From Swiss-Prot:
Localisation per UniProt entry: Cytoplasm
UniProt name for this protein: Chitooligosaccharide deacetylase
Record keywords, A-Z: Carbohydrate metabolism, Chitin degradation, Cytoplasm, Hydrolase, Magnesium, Metal-binding, Polysaccharide degradation
Needed co-factor(s): Mg(2+)
EC number: 3.5.1.105
Top class in the EC scheme: hydrolase
NCBIfam families associated with the record: PRK02134.1
Subunit structure: Homodimer.
Stated role: Involved in the degradation of chitin. ChbG is essential for growth on the acetylated chitooligosaccharides chitobiose and chitotriose but is dispensable for growth on cellobiose and chitosan dimer, the deacetylated form of chitobiose. Deacetylation of chitobiose-6-P and chitotriose-6-P is necessary for both the activation of the chb promoter by the regulatory protein ChbR and the hydrolysis of phosphorylated beta-glucosides by the phospho-beta-glucosidase ChbF.
Principal place of residence: cytoplasm
Catalytic activity: N,N'-diacetylchitobiose + H2O = N-acetyl-beta-D-glucosaminyl-(1->4)-D-glucosamine + acetate; diacetylchitobiose-6'-phosphate + H2O = N'-monoacetylchitobiose-6'-phosphate + acetate
GO molecular function annotation: chitin disaccharide deacetylase activity; deacetylase activity; metal ion binding
Amino acid sequence: MERVLIVNADDFGLSKGQNYGIVEAYRNGVVTSTTALVNGEAIDHAAQLSRELPALGVGIHFVLTLGKPVSEMPGLTRDGLLGKWIWQMAEEDTLPLDEIAHELACQYQRFIDVFGREPTHLDSHHHVHMFPQIFPIVARFAAQRGIALRIDRQTVLNADDLPSDLRSTQGFSSEFYGEEITEACFLRILDASAHRGEASLEVMCHPAFVDNIIRQSAYCYPRLTELEVLTSASLKAAIAERGYRPGSFLDI
């Protein structure tokens, strides 16, 4: 059985070093897709690079935890900025869901304005779209616009409640991260997906060159390790040997 493999690099637009790392992993490695932070400091640079790579699938990386929102969000921001206090608000069930829905629509339009096209798919920074309160908003939005959505099925409370016309990969993995950034780890992810009989799989990654913005991230130098592994010739060969076809979210 032919299986589609989407290797999606998150954080396009975060910094020039991030952008260049993603492009390097696409041109000379196994990355096939990326998602962009429309409020990132280097989003215009990302859009410029993407025009040189029309086959690179570019989706939207919905962000509610970093930087300035596109719209006014007095119920979620502090001093005009987004932050990780969203987790506490989710636990307390005090999320401003109307503001979040409006911000999603605004970020989507911002993506179209910057990139000049619709995004191929939708996911989010720090996976906030998988919060139980936020997921229905994002799932409806993606289904209405006919774009695919990253779904971590281990965290969806009831998969039967998903919109029938919502597209996603059958499998998703965030395991290629942190201490487990090795070719062996990547291949274990593929083998586990194949064992489950999944016809499509998304593997999340964050390849980057380190610059001043990336140095401020808690997840800094591992991004360089990711880039090294993802551009390995042996990894590309091993993926092909397992019968996976590289693709984007337009292929599912």
